[in-house]
């Protein structure tokens, strides 16, 4: 059975790139552009993995990761965080919030797929 991946990404180009790449590798993909909808969408879609942009309008991806960890229905879903604004200490904060993996943009296709497959096993 194909794995389900939800992508929370406000940038349409990145969302399309991640979606097309994962779909080409036989994943079932759901995209969410508005982070405010991410938690409810995750409950409905029940993904095996969430790919979370950290810099989102209206809500921080970091806050969403922390909220997922506090929600009984979502805390077991692994999160791969991606961000264009990788500063000193960001990876530590993101991993401490509960992310299972971290990538800084721009992300190479190979590193992205390795990270996804590494988390999903």
List each model region and its residues.
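Alpha4 helix (beta4-alpha4-beta5 surface) of REC/receiver domains from two-component response regulators
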Residues: 19, 63, 86-103, 111-114
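Short hydrophobic/Thr-rich beta-strand motif most characteristic of the beta2 strand and flanking loop
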Residues: 26-33, 41, 103
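Charged docking surfaces used in two-component/phosphorelay signaling
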Residues: 16-24
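Active-site beta3 strand of CheY-like receiver
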Residues: 45-51, 56
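The feature encodes the CheY-like receiver
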Residues: 57, 66, 75, 87
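Acidic catalytic/metal-coordinating carboxylates
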Residues: 13, 34-37, 60-66, 111
